[in-house]
Amino acid sequence: MMNRFRKWLYKPKRSDPQLLAQFYYADEELNQVAAELDSLDGRKEPQRCTLLVSQFRSCQDNVLNIINQIMEECIPQDRAPRDFCVKFPEEIRHDNLAGQLWFGAECLAAGSIIMNRELESMAMRPLAKELTRSLEDVRGTLRDQALRDLNTYTEKMREALRRFDVLFAEFELSYVSAMVPVKSPREYYVQQEVIVLFCETVERALDFGYLTQDMIDDYEPALMFTIPRLAIVCGLVVYADGPLNLDRKVEDMSELFRPFHTLLRKIRDLLQALTEEELHTLERSLCVSQDVELPIRADTQAPSALAPTFSASLPPEETLSASANNPEAELACSMQYDDQELEELSRMVHRAGDEMSSLLSPPSACQSPAHRPGSEASPRGEASPARARLKSGSDEEERVFFMDDVEVTESPARPESPGNTFELTQGNAQQRGQDGQSGEVGVEAPALVKEEDWSNNNVEGDKIKLASLMGSTSCSCLDSQLYLDGWEVSAEDAETAEMIAHRTGGMKLSATVIFNPKSPTSQDSAVAAQEAPGHGTSPLEPRAEGTGDNSHKLSTTATNCLLHSCVCCGSCGDSRDDAVERLREKCGPGSVISASNPSVSLAKGGDKEPERIDEAQPSDVTLPAEDASNRQEPKAPASSKCLAHTSGPQVDTASRLQGEGEVKGQPEPEARKQDPEKSPVVSGDSPRGDVAQTEHQHLLGSSSTVGSCSLDNTRLDVATAAMPVTPMATREKIRSRFHGSHDLIHRLFVCISGVADQLQTNYASDLRSILKTLFEVMATKPETDDKEKLKKVTQTLRSAALEDCALCQETVSSSELAAKTRDGDFEDPPEWVPDEACGFCTSCKAPFTVIRRKHHCRSCGKIFCSRCSSHSAPLPRYGQVKPVRVCTHCYMFHVTPFYSDKTGM
């Protein structure tokens, strides 16, 4: 009864601006909507129910906002800390968050469960019940105080507000943490480091002229893509110790770049191989918002700063660029093949990590002949790949073997001896080239591969390299089965390079593709030994048996080499190449390293039965060499490859040494002229033509003797560990995998853009927050000194006089105006400009419309729009004591005493 009388007597007015009065009516409206919602049947009137729920949520927001204002006024020093709100995602930090939290607390208190958050819901239910009770106490206390005294805050009300504030802050953190991921302090600190990196990147871009200050001040939309791209480059190269430091743990990286850790490592290696000019070219291309083509460089070789030292030793008439004249060779060895590249780019947005990682490696196992470190091995600039790439999609692709630049068809058969020796025999062979064709690069891809077709491309060094690098070591990370024994394919079943390349999605290589559709597993494999012709001979000369004129046995180690080459990571092949380089430096060009492996055989065509190597012989076996007396040299000599694989940890170091394809002496044609008896041949007239005679005369140069440098595995490891690889060699090795400078920049552009643009999709909220902070920092101009500020303000005020303003032209001081006002001597107000005489705002020149109306300034009488005449001030000089409408100019310079005194200076 007393509350009813108090409500009737002390009920506040609706127009009362005091907070308790506003709360009273907001709470009344909330109770009315809640009562109507309780009495409504939502099944019969779903639309009405939806409308009331929306209205109820709005009323809750209004009540909580007023309570928050009361707490700011009542207990400003006792508020619960809410620093955790900075960790919330930006999309949930809005004005309606408090109402959503209230609604969630009521649902949890009533027994509801958050979907997929059962454990969190059960843990928060006691807190939600306590929060709802505290909120009801606060509402009752404030409503009671609004009926008593609107200007007084009792201690009871203060205590209720303190308790509610603490509970609401605790529930806010718990509820939001359960609904959305909240950053830990460490993650928040890392994100701040990313913000600093972005700011430093923009500073650097401004210094180099990539961006302009106007673009930042205008919030250019293209910067949302440009800045993250440049930040990746700066974070990997310029500020390598920052948040993109890849040498620390992956867990310590920002979650923005953590999924791209492996890809960023590859990008960093390629960026470090760039010159300064190439780096600037890449950064300029990353700043372009439109899809423009990268500038094509005229040179396809490495820049002068990274030019290899061996280029000067090549014959002038046979430079590296000459090898690019053959269009089919360029097609076979180039990295550019548009169809597959376009397909890669189209899938990049959805599979950024895998696809862009593959783009960083050459799409073909064959490198461009004009850009390989092994190009100096032959005047023709030919070299074989450092390693073969395998696609692990199917068994078919794992059983594809490419023989580099050699067109050969061989009928594979089971080896005669099941031990550690593999055999390769050859029947009659036909010579394709006649009368000097041996001096050309014979690169062809035959549509039909015949048994009799043997082509010599003068790639003896390539054969040694391919045999050694493919079969020297096996990578433990690739445990695929060896498809070796018991398969035999006729010439009709062999597929051409075009067919298999088309089916497997790879690039057409001008090489014979040996494909084995079905082959069982073999447990044994051996090391292939290449013959080294010279004056020194070896007592070991095992031979293989030829089965016929037109039937050829393929050593099954060819497939074994491919299956055991490391294709899952690039570091294995790189380390292998580094070991070969260090070994060559130690032993010299005239040394031959033999493996400490007794199972070394030379597969050679002939009628004799294969001879086994006596196991009682020493482990260090010198490479077998053959007398040159039994050889013949046709006009266009042909050769084949003897490939094998090591079944154990032993490494055929001789093959590895020769596999680099280094030429340490005179060119091959001159060597052939001096000693024609030492040239490798495969006689087409003799059924006992030599097969797999891979000699290294061009490796020895003019040296007539072959030295031997026998090392066991332990000494080899010591030698390789003692000689580190120089950074220049590493950069050259990386650059040699790409067709040229333009191709390297293009690959980096694609991958960096893919990673940066992927951030827009995966981490839109974090990136938006980072860019928002970035623009706030970078758009701020450097502040000047206070004296300079004062000078600028004074100059502005003095120059603020308008020529058409009568008040600016008068010379009466403010003191004289004040004296006239005290004496009651008022001036006549200025004449108003007629409405029909002005169709535009005097200040902003905006045309007047039905919506934009005309307003007269009471101080100067001119016509302005509402925006330019929004101020009100008394005009004592005209007798106007109450505030009247004045324009902005008059308000700033003629009405306010401070500015009026300044204008009188």
Swiss-Prot record:
Zn(2+) 1 binds at residues 841, 844, 865, 868. Interacts with TRIM3. Pfam families: FYVE. Enriched in brain (at protein level). The keyword Cell division does not apply. Residues 354-441, 516-552, 589-691 are annotated as: Disordered. Zn(2+) 2 binds at residues 857, 860, 887, 890. Belongs to the lst-2 family. It comes from Mus musculus (Mouse). The keyword Glycosyltransferase does not apply. Negative regulator of epidermal growth factor receptor (EGFR) signaling. Acts by promoting EGFR degradation in endosomes when not monoubiquitinated. It is found in: Cytoplasm, Cytosol; Early endosome membrane. This is Lateral signaling target protein 2 homolog. The modification Phosphothreonine is found at residues 512, 888. Keywords: Cytoplasm, Endosome, Isopeptide bond, Membrane, Metal-binding, Phosphoprotein, Ubl conjugation, Zinc, Zinc-finger. A zinc finger (FYVE-type) spans 835-895. Residues 542-552, 605-615, 659-678 have a biased composition (Basic and acidic residues).
